[in-house]
A protein has these predicted regions:
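Alpha-helical tetratricopeptide repeat
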Residues: 1-128
Length: 128
């Protein structure tokens, strides 16, 4: 039980640091969670959070590597935010067709999301 509390506390601190734009501290905490939770059902969630930190830092290849790991997890329910993050990362890596595909999948899951719609327009402008 105490390991759950520890995991919960570490995640809470990581998210607090993320909100405060302290991405290095958030990455350190997420790295600890990922290492400790190698078999945790939450590992993919931690990888997604870490991918967002990498995205914010401009470390797009690292972000894509984490997103690819999440993609392999058949048990992780991928929400629109996964596809939005993947679409952004692929956009910044100039993989526009793949970016559009990810964003369209995200839009299917959240049809009224204006942020995803804006990103799709941005990608389509690059494809012209």
């Amino acid at each position: 039980m105490s390991s759950d509390i520890s995991e919960e506390s570490l995640l809470s601190t990581a998210l607090d640091n993320f909100i405060l734009d302290n991405y290095e501290a958030a990455l350190n905490q997420l790295n600890s969670l990922i290492t400790k939770g190698e078999t945790s059902p939450n590992k993919s969630e931690y990888l997604l959070y870490r991918a967002v930190c990498f995205l914010k830092q401009g470390k797009f290849e690292n972000a894509l590597k984490d997103l690819d790991e999440v993609e392999k997890d058949a048990n992780y329910k991928k929400e629109y935010n996964y596809y939005l993050t993947r679409g952004k990362v692929l956009y910044y890596l100039c993989k526009f067709e793949e970016s559009k595909k990810a964003l369209n999948t995200g839009l299917e899951l959240n049809k009224d999301n204006n942020l995803i719609k804006d990103w799709i327009k941005k990608v389509e402008n690059e494809l012209k």
